[in-house]
């Protein structure tokens, strides 16, 4: 959350005011107070809802893989690590041979702090294989997705939030796409993801 306007601002601390002149922006941490860790009885804990969502059934924000901000255009020419003239990926590629997101490119880490990160492929596979998945559709509210119940009985909800296709949402209420922190290979333009 941020506020932007060039003004003087009065900051209060310990009952004393200090005027700071010509502030051009103020950024407030997005703490997502509603987000909690859910222990499903797996190797890692899982978030109670998607990034940017206030409830488990809400879609939240959409992110391009390796980008840490939601945006309006998800076309290749707007991708952070795409060079349009050569049509090549500039990071996580054959040159650097990186296949796993660095913390600086992990939306969960940047938005929520160092104790959060996007799951690895192995962690996503564990979620799929060791949990019970049950499709849920609420006709009244219109939300749908999977209740994912862990071996210990705790559960999370993964909404069928679809994905972004260019600047338009695609397949919301029908499919879910969830990133892992890994690319298929450094020779690929594809990241490993959960699809349902």
Residue map of PLM features:
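A short beta-strand micro-motif
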Residues: 7-12
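Acidic/polar residues in short coil/turn loops that connect beta-strands
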Residues: 13-14, 152
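Bacterial Sec-dependent N-terminal signal peptides
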Residues: 1-6
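Structured surface patches comprising rigid loops and adjacent beta-strands/short helices at the edges
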Residues: 16-28
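Short domain-boundary/entry signatures in modular proteins, especially
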Residues: 27-35
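C-terminal, surface-exposed recognition/capping segments
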Residues: 33, 39-196
């Amino acid at each position: 959350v941020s506020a932007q306007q060039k003004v003087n601002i009065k900051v209060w601390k310990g009952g004393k005011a200090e005027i700071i002149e010509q502030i051009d922006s103020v950024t407030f941490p997005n703490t997502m107070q509603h987000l909690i860790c859910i222990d499903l009885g797996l190797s890692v804990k899982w978030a109670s809802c998607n990034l940017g969502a206030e409830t488990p059934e809400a879609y939240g924000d959409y992110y391009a893989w390796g980008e840490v901000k939601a945006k309006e255009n998800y076309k290749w020419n707007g991708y952070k690590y795409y060079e349009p003239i050569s049509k090549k990926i500039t990071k996580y590629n054959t040159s650097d041979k990186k296949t796993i997101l660095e913390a600086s490119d992990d939306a969960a880490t940047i938005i929520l702090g160092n104790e959060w990160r996007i799951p690895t492929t192995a962690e996503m596979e564990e979620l799929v294989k060791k949990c019970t998945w049950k499709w849920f559709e609420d006709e009244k509210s219109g939300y749908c997705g999977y209740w994912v119940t862990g071996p210990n009985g705790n559960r999370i909800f993964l909404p069928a939030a679809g994905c972004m296709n260019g600047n338009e949402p695609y397949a919301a209420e029908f499919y879910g796409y969830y990133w892992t922190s890994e690319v298929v290979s450094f020779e690929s333009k594809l990241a490993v993801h959960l699809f349902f």
